[in-house]
């Protein structure tokens, strides 16, 4: 006999996070949560707590809030775009799996809507199966690893656990590579081809990579495959890493240093794409599109363009559907009495 209602399956699109508003107090709350995660800062926690509370949080939130204010239009860009991605993927999946009730929801590792809160709410509403899709194309312990941690901590508090599957990453998925290449082609059809195309990825400290974090290798694989898809020669593109924090060495080459060197060396035009970001955010709209543009132009460069992230582009939603739908179908096939 079938139950009265078909089983509920939820797909969660998870991104890093954002403050609730572009103010120093809101940014301070967000940074405290983010920078307190030992996945992000791998130094002894008692020592880092002193540095964070005495030196970072008293000064950094005001500067970061001003940067957020420069890109804030009614809401944080990353949350606004995440909601758009959710709506589009929901429209694709809703009603596509027979009698099953499938929904798509946003979640964040830090800030709101927090992943544990979303899980609590949906479980209370009767969701029994989850597909978790972290929107970090290249897995790193500092990003995707934090999603695994949050789910593990949440699970330890549950009496009746739901089923869930996590998509680790998709750095070489053919639809991802094609979507990136096509977005670059469309941009260059309007703005022309540059002297140099830069693939700028968010950096991680070099010691993290030395300990086995696969992120840099995944970034290099993504960039190389997109460059190959575009038919670029080796001297037409480069991979670099941005957003250094603190004084330790990070994975090189550095985006800002490379741009300054190019400007001084006579490189006239540069276009920058940042494949690690599934949605435009502070690091792309302010750091890449504005701050690093100034670095390049002030060093002697003449033309600089940032190529937007995939955001809610239909090809990006195609990728998300291709990642989520087989897992949703997998859950559906195990639900005896409803298949």
Curated annotation (Swiss-Prot):
Gene: hemH
Reactions accelerated catalytically: heme b + 2 H(+) = protoporphyrin IX + Fe(2+)
Organism: Psychrobacter sp. (strain PRwf-1)
Keyword Iron: yes
Class of this enzyme: lyase
Keyword Cytoplasm (UniProt): yes
Xref: HAMAP family: Ferrochelatase (MF_00323)
Lineage of the organism: Bacteria, Pseudomonadati, Pseudomonadota, Gammaproteobacteria, Moraxellales
Record's keyword terms, sorted: Cytoplasm, Heme biosynthesis, Iron, Lyase, Metal-binding, Porphyrin biosynthesis
NCBIfam families registered for this protein in UniProt: hemH
Disulfides per UniProt: none
UniProt-listed GO biological process terms: heme biosynthetic process
Protein name: Ferrochelatase
Source species, domain of life: Bacteria
EC number, as in UniProt: 4.98.1.1
Pathways involved: Porphyrin-containing compound metabolism; protoheme biosynthesis; protoheme from protoporphyrin-IX: step 1/1
UniProt function note: Catalyzes the ferrous insertion into protoporphyrin IX.
Cell compartment(s), UniProt: Cytoplasm
């Amino acid at each position: 006999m079938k139950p009265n209602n078909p089983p509920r399956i939820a797909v969660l699109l998870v991104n890093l996070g954002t403050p609730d508003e572009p103010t120093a107090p809101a940014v301070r709350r967000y940074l405290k949560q983010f920078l307190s995660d030992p996945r992000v800062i791998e130094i002894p926690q008692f020592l880092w707590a002193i540095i964070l509370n005495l030196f970072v949080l008293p000064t950094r939130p005001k500067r970061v809030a001003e940067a957020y204010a420069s890109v804030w239009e009614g809401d944080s860009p990353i949350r606004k775009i995440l909601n758009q991605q959710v709506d589009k993927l929901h429209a694709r999946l809703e009603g596509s799996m027979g009698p099953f009730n499938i929904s798509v929801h946003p979640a964040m590792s830090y800030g709101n809507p927090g992943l544990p809160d979303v899980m609590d709410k949906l479980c209370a509403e009767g969701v029994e199966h989850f597909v978790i899709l972290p929107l970090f194309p290249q897995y790193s312990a500092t990003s995707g690893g934090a999603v695994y941690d949050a789910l593990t901590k949440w699970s330890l508090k549950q009496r009746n656990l739901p089923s869930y599957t996590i998509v680790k990453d998709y750095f070489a998925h053919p639809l991802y590579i094609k979507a990136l290449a096509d977005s670059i082609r469309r941009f260059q059809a309007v703005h022309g081809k540059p002297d140099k195309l830069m693939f700028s990825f968010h950096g991680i400290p070099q010691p993290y990579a030395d300990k086995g974090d696969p992120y840099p290798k995944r970034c290099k694989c993504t960039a190389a495959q997109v460059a190959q898809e575009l038919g670029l020669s080796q001297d037409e593109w480069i991979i670099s890493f941005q957003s250094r924090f603190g004084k330790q060495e990070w994975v090189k080459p550095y985006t800002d240093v490379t741009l300054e060197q190019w400007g001084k060396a006579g490189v006239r035009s540069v276009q920058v794409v940042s494949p690690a970001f599934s949605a435009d955010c502070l690091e792309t709209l302010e750091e890449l599109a504005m701050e690093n543009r100034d670095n390049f132009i002030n060093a002697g460069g003449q033309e600089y363009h940032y190529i937007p992230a995939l955001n809610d582009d239909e090809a990006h939603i195609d990728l998300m559907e291709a990642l989520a739908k087989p897992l949703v179908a997998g859950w559906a096939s195990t639900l005896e009495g409803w298949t």
